[in-house]
Amino acid sequence: EGTQVPANGMYVVTPKGVVMFDTPWDTTQFQPLLDSISLKHHKTVVMCIATHWHSDKTAGLEYYKHRGIKTYTTILTDELSKKNDKKRAEFLMAKDTVFNFGQYSFETYYPGEGHTSDNIVVWFENEKILYGGCLIKGVDETDLGYLGDANKKEYASTLKRVQRKCRNPKFIIIAHNDWKNIHSLKHSLMLAKKLKRNNN
């Protein structure tokens, strides 16, 4: 959780509506985000998937649920959200799940413990887009950020599983700061290997 820093999310516009990944953590941004999406695309948000239990991903789940948006997390994320008094989703995923929505197909993937014990990524196989959330850091980062709930010894192995699953991504969207460099996953793995060495 740590210090507040700018956070990225992602949404996908389809003929059936907009799918959003993660919520803002600033309560004043919950409705303005919906309004700006509606104004720009003339579509409503119909689904939101949060990628782990920290507030920068889950804070808006309850608000969006009351707005009629289908909200999703994994069962593990829900357990941790409940334990830590965070907002919870309406629908729970028991395993990696493929969603076919409009013309898009994407998969939620749990690669193992890293930033948190429940962090998932979202992989668009056809478009080669990886939404890495807080598990992946930008190339300008010198460390892996907040590690208060991290598995320091498993982080590198988890990132290797992401590499094997999500091959040759064209875009990697990360949770914080600039996401435009395609080498963020490789850079994060280097940082995670260093972290593991320092914690052996």
Can you describe what each PLM-predicted range is?
Residues H183-N200:
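Binuclear metal-ion centers of metallo-dependent hydrolases, dominated by the metallo-beta-lactamase
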Residues E1-K16:
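Zn-dependent metallo-beta-lactamase
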Residues P15-G17, T28-Y72, R167-K170:
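Active-site metal-binding motif and surrounding structural segment of the metallo-beta-lactamase
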Residues G17, W25-D26, I75-E113, T116, D118-H183:
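Metallo-beta-lactamase
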Residues V12, D22, I37, H52, ...:
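Divalent metal-coordination and catalytic microenvironments
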Residues Y11, V19-F21, V46-A50, K70-T74, ...:
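Structural recognition of the beta-strand scaffold that forms the well-ordered cores
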Residues G2-V5, T23-F30, W53-K57, G148-K152, ...:
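Solvent-exposed, acidic/flexible segments
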